[in-house]
């Protein structure tokens, strides 16, 4: 902390954030209790449902549950709008759905919940129990997310979702260190604050250099892929109106590499899971000089330590770290350079469509 304690974080309520961290820890206990109830009642499949950013956020949990789960566990990531027209053959009245909505009014999710309830499917939500979605699933099936106090990252939502998913795994005998994970991440918000402070000067530098670029590419994989999409689509496309291309490390070499040329910024997000080998291949290509493009940026979550956290848990918190670095701090600094308010929209929520 000594190296970063004097750094101010722009547009960020530090004390409020730590208070939110204490509150989200308590909310996590409620998510754990929901998972216990699901386990005791039994289930044949788990569905993670979202739209847009919430769909992206659930991607990391889908990855983790498939990584740590047994071969009989069925976990599916579904988009509410798509499910409304296509359904899913594996969903039955014994299935369980976890969804999330900050607004509590997402129409596609509301429509899906109505249909699922008619099927007898149990639906749980991370949302305000007094909102439309909360009322649709019932207050006893909701956990309210804490306010963000100026923080634009998704790490608290990740934490709550992980409490649910990892607890289900724990009750199946697949994630025996669940209690240790909860204990070691109880005060992780202090570390997330320190990571913000450490990254802030670099975020400012990157924003000044690339925020006004005509076109930018973002590459990620594994546990970080959902956050890669979320940052590039929800923050830069939706909130900054930037032209973006996001691509996985494994697909990068099957077409997208031909778009590289001098002057095109390329961001590579490197994670800490099996797919890091794929990220390493992309990094080797970017740094080889063969494209003549020197505007590449490597952001590696492994460079950001969390004291007291077991190495086994790094893969779980890596999306939290990336969200802190990009969705929060880099976005705030882009906003300053572009002078484009992150809350301004031309079409989104402006009228019915």
Where is each model-derived feature located?
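Conserved N-terminal alpha-helical segment that immediately precedes and caps sugar-phosphate-binding
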Residues: 1-353
